[in-house]
């Protein structure tokens, strides 16, 4: 109890004594004396009760310690009055009152003798009153608070959340918070209260408090009658429960709703799941019919609390009943006070026992539900007004259920569409069958849903009072009854540290509850009788007794009697029966009962909850995210808006980017950056809005997938100034790369394409190759090193702002595979033996060409000798490594040049390939707007081949500085593969216009190239004179493909190994280049041809590094393209070795591929993989199968030549490796100029790695050779170059 209240109690015990003039009189112990005694009691009781009720009103409308003390004082005075008058009545009439001839007098004297808490000694009485006051305050001041300090009151905050939120998490937070805040602190106090209350009523001759409460109903069969009524109503409830459970299943899914189990208690629109009408919107039978919830109309019409009470008053007066007295309007609390007072918001009607002061206390909000509550409370006051001239002892309902029923009877009329139309809240009252079902279901959600709750609360309390439910089982028994009768369960685990009954007002408020169950039966009996008096014809649910004086007269007779007659007699006078009966209720709901049974039969619903013990899981991340939007329809509207606006914004940026990439000028760069900023603003605006949704329980996976994708803002998450800096860095790095040139002493300058690329591809002059290789790295990579460091910082910051540990973690997340890195490593190890054999064979050929001075047969290969600037593809040195020079060589370049092929002819040929498969031809915009040759007008352009989607579903282009050769013909097919993918998924939402994973996009074109590059296909398009099918030709062909595909694999793997380590900090800024060459040595077996240092930045000499393009996609694509190829060849009916397959003109293969491409990013990539290959995993099996003949040949050849697999002389370089400079304390290590201590440490590390590497390589090579015909299986994801 409050400390201040404790100090006041000794004083209160004195002031609680009755004032002079209020004591019982001396009167004769006769029936005549009893008449005088009863008269004196009545006038005195009015004084005492007025004081007690006034004190209680003051406390309930201003919860302060002082008011609590005054309430306790007034309660003590009332109890002293009850005690003194009761004991006097017992003394004078205890032996004779039952023999009185006047039945009214008999009832009055009998009730005066029931003392209740007044039986208790003063100290216990004080304790009893204080417990009730404390419990009242705990309940009324309970709040649910958030981490940010915001707190919710029950009214209106929590009630609104329970009524309107559809967020599983938010509802759970409100439900759990309220039960913990309001219920748990009451547990010990309630146990004390039960002990004291039982003690008090046992002194009046009752077994316990429950027995006393039941005595008001004056029926020896009361409990049996209730059970009989409940059994009558149960089938209707079970059908309603099953229907509602199915609708909640549709909304929340199988995770949270079990169609054979109880319903989680927080999902039914009300804190106690006692009425379900607030979730009517989730289960409207006929949504196209007029909405019966007139809340919005009330708000729009400017209704306020006072007007709602005036409308209710007018209903009563229209029946010829009494209007509210002036005191009602002057003294009622009809709204929650705005002055900060703590009040008891629970709606209640008050009789001050002076026959003129009647009030309502309600924190009214303008809603339809509250309009009914207003009528309910006004019904109580009308009852008070009608029986105010009865003796105090008879100022009550005929039984407690009568009082509750009166206002609700009025609500049955008020809620009809015809009445709502009469008072201007509905434009029309359509009464067709569908509208009737809508109306009746809404009423059932209020009335029928309530019945088991109304029944069980006092079942629980009667068991508590009787001791059948001991304190150790308070909460267990509560939830047992709630599941047994209501078919609901707690949404979180509850135990005996909780006290969930206390979270319902009537428990701490000590208000018996069975009255509400009784009233829900009686109100329909009353309604039927009053409708008959009003001459209503038609179904009972359409009756409105508004303005019927006849109905009013019948009602008045019930009200005026108060409790002066038995309720059975009053009920009989109104209805013609003296028993409670569910017949009228069942008649009222008859149409919807039939409809519910039909609906449940259609969906084969289980009635009841046989899986009694089922409980829902706790939501992931709970209680985080409770304020997020969970309305799926709202999410769909948002995504529709996003899609249409994104198409415009993305198109504008892509156009500007195209202009810049095809004409590198400062102006075009500025425009591109401006459009990029606009796109970033759009991304961040919609990304932040997307983050406001919690899609975890959405039923449409597409909506969830897009929202999750949108929520990742990428670079747009950066502050605007840093975003501008980031974009400028990327633009500057890409520009530096694109305009870089290598100049000779005679001032002749060479761009990368086509000059340097041609030198690397065709020259066999060691020094000329070295000039191009070193010159390119000096001109490109070295110049962007400092910018790259800042780029890494900003990239990581953006990743962290998106919820990732670093940028590498974000890049890997695009593959939606937790084991992605492990899967890649497993794939690489499967493929490594093939690479090692190819490396050893090529190294021998280069040794034969360049000699021991430049090549070590046990060391790495100098990186500039492999025909490509980055040694990623070795196909340009095929002439040096050709296994059988006299056999047919597959090279279409001479024929292309001889036949006068042009870049456009190359693209047209590629288009023919795709259309031969039944795929989509290139649209006209493609031919009109693509840049397929390097412009001859001197413009600086980005030559790196790329395919472009302009996001308007019609404009797709390729930018390529095409050269007429076979290599570029393959590249053309690759880029056209991207465009075909664009065309296939162009009707997907913009968020899904992407590959199933980044590797898929890269693989599609290359799959075509695997067919295009076959001798059979080249012959069919007249680029090869003949197709020679023998082992030597096959090995030549497979070698040409392996120099492109297999040689690429370690490079495709290591590029992002390096970047991921840069992003996560494992590679520091001062070792960028050293670690780059460590990886190139480890995986590719390459070394730099000249010394390198940290002044160089060789990673930056590769386009994808300055351009910020992730690279692992290419490794992924090189694996999965063979899986695709194998599956498409099977669909095309190919027989024979996989490397001879050409799917040209196979519509079956085309359909398989097209169906997968149409998905875009709309499904996780394994589903697209399943569509094409029939299984969901990445695997190297198809690749190994494709190259099996070559692998067999390489192993044999290398064995014959005594080749060493790997590069055990890892520190060998083609220049002096032991050049020391004592003055600078540096050494040359792996081509790097580093400190001597670093070099020593590095040497030991690499020695250990080399030994492991050598042993592993030999083991894998032997293992593969001995079991090469076995399948290679793995799982993962992949891409291209």
UniProtKB/Swiss-Prot annotation:
Membrane topology note: Single-pass type I membrane protein
Cytoplasmic topological segments:
1263-1281
Comment on bound cofactor: Binds 2 Zn(2+) ions per subunit. Binds 3 chloride ions per subunit.
> What domain of life does the UniProt record list for this protein's source?
Eukaryota
Please state the protein's primary subcellular location. Answer: membrane
Q: Where is the Peptidase M2 domain?
A: 28-610, 629-1208
- Glycosylation site list: 42, 62, 80, 99, 148, 304, 495, 535, 573, 601, 643, 663, 746, 1177
| Required co-factors | Zn(2+); chloride
Question: Which biological processes are named by the entry's GO terms?
Answer: angiotensin maturation; bradykinin catabolic process; cell population proliferation; hormone catabolic process; hormone metabolic process; kidney development; positive regulation of systemic arterial blood pressure; primitive erythrocyte differentiation
Locate the residues binding Zn(2+) 1: 376, 380, 404
Subcellular localization is given as: Cell membrane; Cytoplasm
Query: Where is the catalytic site?
Result: 377, 506, 975, 1104
State the UniProt keywords alphabetically.
Carboxypeptidase, Cell membrane, Cytoplasm, Disulfide bond, Glycoprotein, Hydrolase, Membrane, Metal-binding, Metalloprotease, Phosphoprotein, Protease, Repeat, Signal, Transmembrane, Transmembrane helix, Zinc
Top-level EC class: hydrolase
Pfam families cross-referenced by the UniProt entry: Peptidase_M2 (PF01401)
- Which transformation does this protein catalyse, written as a reaction? Release of a C-terminal dipeptide, oligopeptide-|-Xaa-Yaa, when Xaa is not Pro, and Yaa is neither Asp nor Glu. Thus, conversion of angiotensin I to angiotensin II, with increase in vasoconstrictor activity, but no action on angiotensin II; angiotensin I + H2O = L-histidyl-L-leucine + angiotensin II; bradykinin + H2O = L-Phe-L-Arg + bradykinin(1-7); substance P + H2O = substance P(1-9) + L-Leu-L-Met-NH2
Q: Which residues does the record give as chloride 3 binding sites?
A: 815, 1113
- E.C. numbers: 3.4.15.1
GO CC annotations on file: cytoplasm; membrane; plasma membrane
Record-given protein name: Angiotensin-converting enzyme
Species name for this entry? Answer: Gallus gallus
């Amino acid at each position: 109890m409050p400390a201040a209240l404790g100090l006041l109690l000794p004083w209160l015990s004195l002031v609680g004594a009755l004032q002079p003039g209020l004591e019982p009189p001396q009167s004769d112990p006769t029936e005549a004396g009893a008449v005088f005694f009863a008269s004196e009691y009545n006038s005195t009781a009015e004084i005492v009760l007025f004081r007690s009720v006034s004190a209680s009103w003051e406390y309930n409308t201003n919860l302060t310690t002082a008011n609590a003390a005054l309430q306790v004082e007034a309660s003590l005075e009332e109890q002293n009055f009850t005690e003194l008058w009761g004991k006097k009545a017992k003394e004078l009439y205890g032996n004779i009152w039952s023999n009185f001839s006047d039945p009214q007098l008999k009832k009055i004297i009998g009730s005066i003798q029931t003392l209740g808490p007044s039986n208790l000694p003063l100290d216990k009485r004080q304790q009893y009153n204080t417990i009730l006051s404390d419990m009242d305050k705990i309940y009324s001041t309970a709040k649910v608070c958030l981490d940010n300090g915001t707190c919710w009151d029950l009214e209106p905050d929590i009630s609104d959340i329970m009524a309107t939120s559809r967020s599983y998490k938010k509802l759970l937070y409100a439900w759990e918070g309220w039960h913990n805040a309001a219920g748990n602190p009451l547990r010990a106090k309630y146990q004390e209260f039960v002990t004291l209350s039982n003690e008090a009523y046992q002194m009046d001759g009752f077994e316990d408090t429950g027995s006393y409460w039941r005595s008001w109903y004056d029926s020896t069969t009361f409990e049996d009658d209730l059970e009989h009524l409940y059994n009558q109503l149960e089938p209707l409830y079970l059908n309603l429960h099953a229907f509602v459970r199915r609708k909640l299943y549709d909304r929340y899914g199988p995770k949270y709703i079990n169609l054979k189990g109880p319903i989680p208690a927080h999902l039914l629109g009300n804190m106690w799941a006692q009425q379900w009408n607030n979730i009517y919107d989730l289960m409207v039978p006929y949504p196209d019919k007029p909405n019966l919830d007139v809340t919005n109309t009330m708000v729009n019409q400017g209704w306020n609390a006072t007007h709602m009470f005036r409308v209710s008053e007018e209903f009563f007066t229209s029946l010829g009943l009494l209007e509210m007295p002036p005191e009602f309007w002057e003294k009622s609390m009809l709204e929650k006070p705005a002055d900060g007072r703590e009040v008891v918001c629970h709606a209640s009607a008050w009789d001050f026992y002076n026959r003129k002061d009647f009030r309502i206390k309600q924190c009214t909000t303008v809603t339809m539900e509250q309009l009914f509550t207003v009528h309910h409370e006004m019904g109580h006051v009308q009852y008070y007004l009608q029986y105010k001239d009865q003796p105090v002892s008879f100022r009550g309902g005929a039984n407690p259920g009568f009082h509750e029923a009166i206002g609700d009877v009025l609500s049955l009329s008020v809620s009809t569409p015809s009445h709502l139309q009469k008072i201007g809240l509905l434009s029309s009252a359509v009464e067709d069958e569908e509208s009737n079902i809508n109306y009746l279901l809404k009423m059932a959600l209020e009335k029928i849903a309530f019945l088991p709750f109304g029944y069980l609360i006092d079942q629980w309390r009667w068991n508590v009072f009787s001791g059948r439910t001991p304190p150790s089982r308070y909460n267990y028994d509560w939830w047992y009854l709630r599941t047994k009768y209501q078919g609901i369960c707690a949404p979180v685990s509850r135990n005996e540290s909780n006290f969930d009954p206390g979270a319902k007002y009537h428990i701490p408020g000590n208000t018996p509850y069975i009255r509400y169950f009784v009233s829900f039966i009686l109100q329909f009996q009353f309604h039927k009788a009053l409708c008959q008096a009003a001459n209503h014809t038609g179904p009972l649910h359409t009756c409105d007794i508004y303005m019927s004086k006849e109905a009013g007269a019948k009602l008045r007779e019930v009200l005026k009697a108060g409790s002066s007659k038995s309720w059975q007699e009053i009920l009989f006078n109104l209805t013609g029966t003296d028993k409670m009966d569910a017949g009228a209720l069942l008649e009222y709901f008859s149409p919807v009962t039939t409809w519910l049974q039909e609906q449940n039969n259609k969906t084969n619903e289980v009635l009841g909850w046989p899986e009694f013990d089922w409980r829902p899981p706790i939501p992931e991340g709970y209680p985080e995210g409770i304020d997020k939007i969970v309305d799926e329809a709202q999410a769909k509207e948002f995504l529709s808006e996003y899609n249409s606006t994104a198409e415009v914004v993305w198109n504008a940026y892509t156009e500007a980017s195209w202009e810049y990439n095809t004409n590198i000028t400062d102006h075009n760069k500025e425009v591109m950056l401006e459009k990029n900023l606009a796109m970033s603003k759009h991304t961040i605006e919609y990304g932040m809005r997307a983050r406001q949704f919690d899609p975890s329980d959405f039923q449409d996976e597409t909506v969830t997938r897009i929202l999750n994708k949108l929520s990742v803002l990428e670079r747009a998450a950066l502050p605007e100034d840093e975003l501008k800096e980031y974009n400028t860095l990327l633009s500057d790095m890409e520009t530096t790369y694109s305009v870089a040139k290598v100049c000779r002493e005679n001032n002749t300058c060479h761009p990368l394409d086509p000059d340097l690329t041609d030198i690397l591809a065709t020259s066999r002059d060691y020094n000329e190759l070295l000039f191009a290789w070193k010159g390119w790295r000096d001109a490109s990579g070295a110049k962007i090193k400092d910018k790259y460091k800042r780029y890494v910082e900003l990239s990581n910051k953006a990743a962290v702002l998106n919820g990732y540990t670093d940028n590498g973690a974000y890049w890997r997340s695009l593959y939606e595979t937790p084991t992605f890195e492990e899967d890649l490593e497993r794939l690489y190890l499967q493929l490594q033996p093939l690479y090692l054999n190819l490396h050893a064979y090529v190294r021998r050929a280069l040794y034969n060409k360049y000699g021991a001075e430049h090549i070590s047969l046990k060391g790495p290969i100098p990186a500039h000798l492999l025909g490509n600037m980055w040694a990623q593809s070795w196909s340009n040195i095929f002439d040096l490594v050709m296994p059988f020079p006299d056999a047919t060589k597959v090279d279409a370049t001479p024929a292309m040049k001889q036949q006068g092929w042009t870049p456009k002819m190359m693209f047209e040929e590629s288009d023919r390939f795709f259309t031969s498969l039944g795929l989509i031809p290139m649209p006209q915009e493609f031919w009109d707007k693509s840049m397929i040759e390097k412009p001859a007008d001197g413009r600086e352009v980005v030559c790196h081949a790329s395919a472009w989607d302009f996001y308007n579903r019609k404009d797709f282009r390729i930018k390529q500085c095409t050269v007429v050769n076979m290599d570029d013909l393959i590249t053309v097919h690759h880029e056209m593969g991207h465009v075909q993918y664009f065309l296939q998924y162009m009707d997907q939402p913009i968020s899904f216009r992407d590959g199933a994973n980044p590797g898929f996009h890269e693989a599609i074109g290359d799959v075509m190239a695997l067919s295009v590059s076959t001798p059979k296909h080249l012959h069919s398009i007249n680029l090869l004179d003949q197709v020679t099918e023998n082992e030597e030709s096959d090995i030549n062909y497979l070698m040409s493909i392996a120099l492109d595909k297999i040689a690429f694999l370690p490079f495709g793997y290591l590029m992002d190994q390096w970047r991921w380590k840069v992003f996560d900090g494992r590679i520091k800024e001062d070792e960028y280049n050293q670690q780059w060459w460590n990886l190139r040595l480890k995986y590719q077996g390459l070394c730099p041809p000249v010394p390198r240092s940290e002044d160089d930045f060789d990673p930056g000499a590769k386009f994808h590094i300055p351009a910020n393009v992730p690279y692992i996609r290419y490794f992924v694509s090189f694996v999965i393209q063979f899986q695709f190829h194998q599956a498409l060849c099977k669909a095309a009916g190919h027989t024979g070795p996989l490397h001879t397959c050409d799917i040209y003109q196979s519509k079956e293969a085309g359909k398989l591929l097209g169906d997968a491409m149409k998905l875009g990013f709309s499904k996780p990539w394994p589903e697209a993989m399943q569509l094409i290959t029939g299984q969901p995993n990445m695997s190297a099996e198809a690749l190994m199968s494709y190259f099996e003949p070559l692998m067999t040949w390489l192993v044999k050849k290398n064995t014959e030549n005594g080749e060493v697999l790997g590069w055990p002389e890892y520190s060998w370089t083609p220049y002096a490796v032991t050049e020391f400079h004592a003055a600078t304390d540096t050494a040359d290590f792996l081509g790097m100029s580093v400190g001597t201590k670093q070099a020593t440490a590095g040497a030991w590390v690499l020695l250990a790695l080399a030994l492991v590497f050598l042993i592993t390589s030999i083991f894998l090579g032997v293992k593969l050779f001995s079991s090469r015909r076995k399948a290679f299986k793995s799982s993962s994801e992949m891409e291209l170059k």
